[in-house]
Curated annotation (Swiss-Prot):
It holds the Pfam family FKBP_C. GO terms for cellular component: endoplasmic reticulum; endoplasmic reticulum lumen. Belongs to the FKBP-type PPIase family. The keyword ATP-binding does not apply. The gene is fkr-5. PPIases accelerate the folding of proteins. It catalyzes the cis-trans isomerization of proline imidic peptide bonds in oligopeptides. InterPro entries: FKBP2/11, PPIase_dom_sf, PPIase_FKBP_dom. It comes from Neurospora crassa (strain ATCC 24698 / 74-OR23-1A / CBS 708.71 / DSM 1257 / FGSC 987). Keywords: Endoplasmic reticulum, Isomerase, Rotamase, Signal. Its EC number is 5.2.1.8. This is FK506-binding protein 2. Residues 41-129 form the PPIase FKBP-type domain. Residues 1-20 form the signal peptide. It catalyses: [protein]-peptidylproline (omega=180) = [protein]-peptidylproline (omega=0).
Amino acid sequence: MKSIFLSLSLLASATVGVLAAEELGIDVTVPVECDRKTRKGDKINVHYRGTLQSNGQQFDASYDRGTPFSFKLGGGQVIKGWDEGLVDMCIGEKRTLTVPPSYGYGQRSIGPIPAGSTLIFETELIGIDGVPKPESIVYKQAAEKAEEAASAVEEKVAEATDKAGGKIADATKKVEEKAEEASANVVEKVASVVSGAAEAVKTVVADTDDVQEHNEL
């Protein structure tokens, strides 16, 4: 019974591995911000470079020809991996597609591509027919870095402000303490002077009384 469960477990693991290997991989290598993304039915212009996952050998590249490839997205004019992997893409965006046989050429041998091959496509969306090209391409990474930099500056300013506020508070407290100390010293000195003056007056009065008593005698 244990061996049966073990066999079933291994079979399930192998099935999961096969299903994972058959999934279309979409890696956005250069993300871009835009309002109008590709959708099925668009005629798009794409630059690409295709290689075999097994050995990295290049089998085709529009970059080498200097002309992007044009086709109707979702119209079945290209392999399934492209029809599904290039949807919701911005002009200027780059993606790397990992295309398993079920999304590529299956078990057919096509030119330099052996049967059952997993293909790697480096793609770049050059344009969408009928959609004006943006005057400038806003790269997400640059925007995110700018936001991070601005956030970091704000944090530094807040930190510096807190430190400065603390130092000012400390300095104010020290000034107040010194002022209180100086005031106390002044009061003490004034009291001492007043006390001395009072003693002097007492002495003068006492001397005057002595003189009067002597004259009366």
